Amino acid sequence: MDFGDDLELVGAEITVKEINYVSELTGLTFPDDTEPVGYYFLGSGIDRSLVLKVMIQGDQREEFLKNEIFEKGNDAKSNHHIAKQQEWWKVNELTERIDRKFELPKLKYVECTVGLEEGKTFVYVTWFEI
């Protein structure tokens, strides 16, 4: 996505292309059978930002938690304003929640929250630059 483009996708509209783009920006590795829920890329602002919600299989949770952000990131809850504007963003309803924030090069940041929602494992990601 380039500066000036905003893109919102829900469920099946989200393809491997968007998941791979999030991986490229954040360094997060997602399981092959990740089920997308919501994706929003804000490119029209001064600083780009992105939010993503996916579901992963419960037996893949421990493997997902091996991503660098969970080993080296700070324990911090995400409160990015564009995330809160998405109807599918229900991070405050999670149980067994793990929150991390990690600074990337060039004043970019990634936040990731993993937890249970109605007994299923969901991953919430925010990425932004300042």
Language-model-derived ranges and their functions:
Residues V22, R48, K106-K108:
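Residues that act as N-cap/strand-start positions at coil-to-secondary-structure junctions
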Residues T29-D33, V37-L94:
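Mature extracytoplasmic domains of secretory-pathway proteins
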Residues M1-L42:
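N-terminal leader/targeting segments
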